[in-house]
């Protein structure tokens, strides 16, 4: 739960900071509904797009991922060959492949586009899983890349952020208006920030729901690529190994929660396994 609230707080904080910067620069949302919507879109999409463009850099820095340029071991060579073969099946440029040091079994995919991506696995994943299970995890992450989930998630976050800013400003305009038609600037800013935080939390439920659906879709993509039994075996292995990632990377990891929640980025492992068994 702590990870989820930090994720929500980060997104809301980005919106607040952008609003403050625009206010300091003298760029405001005054005008008609069309101008306000355009302003809201700028605020709503800026943070999401910047995060997407910097996603590989942020991912590498946050977990200390080391990209495999030239394989030094048989295991690294196998990882590169497996990812390359899966990328060919998706008709994609081979993603960068990286390993990061962590005892917890996990993996994630990120990148600005389908042909500019990164797949990283933890040393814990390589230590705890069989080759078949690691292959399934790689296929799951490749499905995220092939489905364009990183870009889609960014667009959805940008859209909901836009309406969060738009609706909070509409309400602030109404509340801050004085009887003589003038407007209290301090009240307007304070009210808009309060409602931005409130609507930001509610809008995040939509993003979380989409994230859970993309996990089911990536599981199905992995099953199609390597077979459902391998993917089921990998998820069952994760049930016995609690995992963790930095907050900003949590939505991109393979592991999920042990139970379902509206604030979860992943469905429960039991539900994912049940969905795979029904394919």
From Swiss-Prot:
EC number: 3.4.24.-
GO CC aspect terms: plasma membrane
Molecular function terms, GO-annotated: metalloendopeptidase activity; zinc ion binding
GO biological process, one term: proteolysis
Membrane-spanning segments: 4-24, 34-54, 155-175, 189-209
SS bond list: none
Cofactors, names only: Zn(2+)
Enzyme active site: 141
Family: Belongs to the peptidase M48B family.
Recorded name of the encoding gene: htpX
Details of cofactor binding: Binds 1 zinc ion per subunit.
Organism phylogeny: Bacteria, Pseudomonadati, Pseudomonadota, Betaproteobacteria, Neisseriales
PROSITE patterns linked: ZINC_PROTEASE
PANTHER family: PROTEASE HTPX (PTHR43221:SF1)
Location of the protein in the cell: Cell inner membrane
UniProt keyword ATP-binding present: no
Organism (species): Neisseria gonorrhoeae (strain ATCC 700825 / FA 1090)
Protein name: Protease HtpX homolog
Topology within the bilayer: Multi-pass membrane protein
Keyword line: Cell inner membrane, Cell membrane, Hydrolase, Membrane, Metal-binding, Metalloprotease, Protease, Transmembrane, Transmembrane helix, Zinc
């Amino acid at each position: 739960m702590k990870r989820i609230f930090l994720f929500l707080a980060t997104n809301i904080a980005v919106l607040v900071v952008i609003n403050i910067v625009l206010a300091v620069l003298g760029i405001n949302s005054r005008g008609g509904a069309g101008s306000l919507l355009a302003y809201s879109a700028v605020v709503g999409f800026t943070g999401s797009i910047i995060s997407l463009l910097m996603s590989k850099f942020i991912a590498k820095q946050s977990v200390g991922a080391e990209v495999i340029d030239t394989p030094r071991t048989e295991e690294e060579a196998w990882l590169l060959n497996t990812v390359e073969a899966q990328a060919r099946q998706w008709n994609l440029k081979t993603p960068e492949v990286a390993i990061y040091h962590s005892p917890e079994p996990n993996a994630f995919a990120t990148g600005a586009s389908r042909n500019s991506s990164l797949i990283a696995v933890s040393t814990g994943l390589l230590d705890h899983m069989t080759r078949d299970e690691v292959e399934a995890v790689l296929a799951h992450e490749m499905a995220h890349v092939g489905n364009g989930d990183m870009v889609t998630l960014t667009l959805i976050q940008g859209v909901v952020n836009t309406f969060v800013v738009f609706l909070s400003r509409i309400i602030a305009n109404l509340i801050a208006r004085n009887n003589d038609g003038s407007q209290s600037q301090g009240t307007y800013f304070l009210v808009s920030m309060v409602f931005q935080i409130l609507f930001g939390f509610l809008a995040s439920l939509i993003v979380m729901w989409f994230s859970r659906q993309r996990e089911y879709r990536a599981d199905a993509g992995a099953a199609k690529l390597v077979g459902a039994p391998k993917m089921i075996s990998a998820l069952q292995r994760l049930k016995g190994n609690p995992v963790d990632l930095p907050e900003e990377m949590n939505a991109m990891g393979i592991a999920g929660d042990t139970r379902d929640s509206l604030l979860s980025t992943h469905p429960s492992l039991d539900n994912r396994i049940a969905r795979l068994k029904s394919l």
